[in-house]
Amino acid sequence: MDSLVTANTKFCFDLFQEIGKDDRHKNIFFSPLSLSAALGMVRLGARSDSAHQIDEVLHFNEFSQNESKEPDPCLKSNKQKAGSLNNESGLVSCYFGQLLSKLDRIKTDYTLSIANRLYGEQEFPICQEYLDGVIQFYHTTIESVDFQKNPEKSRQEINFWVECQSQGKIKELFSKDAINAETVLVLVNAVYFKAKWETYFDHENTVDAPFCLNANENKSVKMMTQKGLYRIGFIEEVKAQILEMRYTKGKLSMFVLLPSHSKDNLKGLEELERKITYEKMVAWSSSENMSEESVVLSFPRFTLEDSYDLNSILQDMGITDIFDETRADLTGISPSPNLYLSKIIHKTFVEVDENGTQAAAATGAVVSERSLRSWVEFNANHPFLFFIRHNKTQTILFYGRVCSP
């Protein structure tokens, strides 16, 4: 399963570069885990070049051989069941099944809803073996709807399901024109996350403060402040600080990568984005680079909500055939040779405030005052990167860039 986590993280950075390439100054927020799982569902039923392209872009091809040499005994029964589906896609799905089960089992201290579902035109029969695999490994189903005769009803049905899965935070996933009578297969992907900080911010310490958007422009934001013990480090290679803010009981953390303050903060951010890789992220967030220090923390309150039409993004990354009616091979999903993926939409919502990610009551730990000279300052008053990680599995659940809170 470790190789799956590695593959997901590499895909995270690749996707971030693709989303942000046309605008280096916009906010970005997405869930690499949920997207990888969603595309893993498609991979389970993809064949020939359609499968190979997914493997390449999501780095699935980099771990299958290594994992099969030293198979995880916990997955022995799963692999036996998956083997009849397709050797490589079965292996990918087995590891997703284990990872998603781990996340489901231990989320009593936070809410994480990964809403993945395929909606297919009812004229296309679905292979029972594929249905069984999706339920077993991805904890979801494929729904048959009448796109041809009633696309608007289908759109409303999909939107309602997503709104329920996201506790009402994600509405109108598909706009009125997004679904039509030509639609045949839609992959729905929405994520909702809610957790409390291990050490909350006192509302009384939140103040209006300037946030440097670029070399010439500032913006007034609500800046939360806190003194406490945090894991913090400095990355000499990119001249940036890295700080860990833990959620309740430390099962998940938000890591913030903050370039050193300069005349043009965006240049520092661009340099950080260019150099970040999976291997460097592991090193930068390790105990060798980070230590617990007394920190004066200033962090902006912010809300990010975004929607990504991933068809063109994934095609630019190399996944092309599954979107092409003449080239798609999804015969593992349906025996029909005409099935192709019409649309992938990814929508996310995050709200960071004094209590945590999403508003919730919290009780803060008391930190005794120390000599002011011993405090390290971490002032996120200019653009930064952040990611939310499940610490036990090292899985990046969310990744983002804040240029304008």
From Swiss-Prot:
Q: Give the source's domain of life in one word.
A: Eukaryota
> Per UniProt, which keywords does this protein have?
Cytoplasm, Protease inhibitor, Serine protease inhibitor
Q: Which InterPro entries match?
A: Serpin_CS (IPR023795), Serpin_dom (IPR023796), Serpin_fam (IPR000215), Serpin_sf (IPR036186), Serpin_sf_1 (IPR042178), Serpin_sf_2 (IPR042185)
* Alphabetized CDD domains for the sequence: serpinB12_yukopin (cd19571)
GO cellular component entries: collagen-containing extracellular matrix; cornified envelope; cytoplasm; extracellular space; ficolin-1-rich granule membrane; plasma membrane
List the GO molecular function terms: enzyme binding; serine-type endopeptidase inhibitor activity
Q: Which residues cross the membrane?
A: none
Q: Where is this region: Disordered?
A: 64-83
Q: What is its main location?
A: cytoplasm
Where is the site Reactive bond? Answer: R370, S371
The UniProt record lists the keyword Manganese: no
The record's subcellular location field reads: Cytoplasm
**Tissue expression as described in the entry:** Expressed in many tissues, including brain, bone marrow, lymph node, heart, lung, liver, pancreas, testis, ovary, and intestine.
Q: Name one GO biological process term.
A: hematopoietic progenitor cell differentiation
| Keyword Repressor on entry | no
- Which Pfam family, an example, fits this chain? Serpin
Its function, per the record, reads:
Inhibits trypsin and plasmin, but not thrombin, coagulation factor Xa, or urokinase-type plasminogen activator. May play a role in cell differentiation.
**Subunit structure as annotated in this protein's UniProt entry:** Interacts with SLFN12; as part of a pathway regulating cell differentiation. May interact with USP14.
Family statement:
Belongs to the serpin family. Ov-serpin subfamily.
Q: What is this protein called?
A: Serpin B12
Q: What is the lineage of its organism?
A: Eukaryota, Metazoa, Chordata, Craniata, Vertebrata
